[in-house]
Amino acid sequence: AEGDVGRVYDGRGEIEERQLSLDDVPATSTKVMVNLANPDAALDWWRLPTDGIGLARMEFVVGEHIKAHPMALAHPDRLVDPDARRQVAELTRHYDSPAEYFVDRLASGIATLAAPWADRPVILRMSDFKTNEYAGLLGGAQFEPAEENPMLGWRGASRYYHPGYRDGFALECRAVRRVRERIGFPNVT
């Protein structure tokens, strides 16, 4: 198969196999780091001879392990959709609060990413969802504007200090602080 358009060739392809020794490869001054988003992938790639994680993206943890919009968890009382309110209550029922659910789940995911590289740097990027992606999270539609081009819209650092997301960003910061100070991974930056 090739790219977006599959091609099938008749017969067997010729494969050349060579054994290479890495013993004589000189060390470089360039750090070789991996990029990861899925905490489970950290457990697959930890044996690679890398200098750490060059980019750990938290969006996967939020989307796959938390599943709800940070503002819906920071302010579940603001949810106008009764079904979303019920789902948030169900999702977070084992926690003291929906906010604690977010902080705990995010901290756990980040710690899982960081654990195999505990002795090396883990560079974490705070959330960078596009508005349409945030809107797809539980309770997210009511907290996100409709944008013609979400790729160029309200995302990244411009979102963090905005009153419409400031409390969600505070939850992200609490999770990172927990990872660094309570769980014990000060290598996460």
Predicted regions and their residues:
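Nucleic-acid-contacting surfaces of polymerase cores and analogous helical-repeat interfaces
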Residues: 5-7
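Conserved alpha/beta-domain cores
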Residues: 18-189
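Beta-strand/loop-dominated core regions that host nucleotide or nucleotide-derived cofactor-binding catalytic loops
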Residues: 12-13
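Conformationally flexible catalytic loops at phosphate/diphosphate-handling active centers
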Residues: 1-2
